[in-house]
Amino acid sequence: MDLVLDAMEIRVLGSLIEKELATPEYYPLTLNALTNACNQKSNRDPVVAYDEASVASAAARLVEKGLVWESGVSRVPKYEERFTHERSLVPRESAVLCVLLLRGPQTVGEIRGRTARLHDFANLEEVQAALDNLVEWGYAQQLARMPGHKESRYRDLLRGEVEAPKGPADLKLPDIPPIEIARIEKVEAAVERMQKEIEDLKTAFETFKKQFD
């Protein structure tokens, strides 16, 4: 496809799609919340440590490309993604694309396991159907099966087309155990709630101060 994003833009877009599906009550995201989402330790490959200025720059580029919208209604600007809405993707397709953006190439089984928080797929056939649609529309690509592997993997095409890896260099470290992921996600959700409460308090305080200006 003609649209090619860099690694930071991919992370920002993927994080926005994820939060819209997983925690809509805290969406759209402030710059602080978006930065934290990009830097999550769970459900990210690779794990990164972007600063707010870099995330703001990437978000601005996505706004220019029409993939993200920056809301200026509230005192604190907030970001929301437009990609899935402009292209009329349904939740199951958005969920699959999201994990491809955040985790890189994966098998159908891996995708189903990693989309559990985003969409309830009844079986692998539903995941495959969503993937087939994304491939047909030019948003995903099926990679050649690696030697010694039974299943093919899929990757997103928003970062451009690349040749499928041909050797063991593509091997990844084992995933974090599910019980540990659940614990981390609970902590991250609690942090998000506290950050939103702090932002609400700041807004209320600014409003209170204006009464005496």
Model-based region annotation:
Residues M1-I10, A22-E25, N43, V48, ...:
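Eukaryotic, polar/proline-rich low-complexity intrinsically disordered regions
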Residues D6-E25, R87-G104, E136:
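Positively charged, polyanion-binding regions of nucleic-acid-associated proteins
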Residues T23-A49, P105-F121:
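Short acidic, hydrophobic short linear motifs in intrinsically disordered regions
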Residues A56-A59, V63-S74, L131-M146:
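A short, conserved structural fragment
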Residues S74, E81-E110, S152, D156-A182, ...:
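Short, amphipathic alpha-helical interaction segments positioned at domain boundaries
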Residues F83-A130, G138-Q141, R145-P147:
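Extended, charged alpha-helical interaction scaffolds
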Residues R114, A144-L158, E199, T203-D213:
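Helical coiled-coil/dimerization "stalks"
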Residues L173-Q211:
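Amphipathic alpha-helical oligomerization/assembly segments
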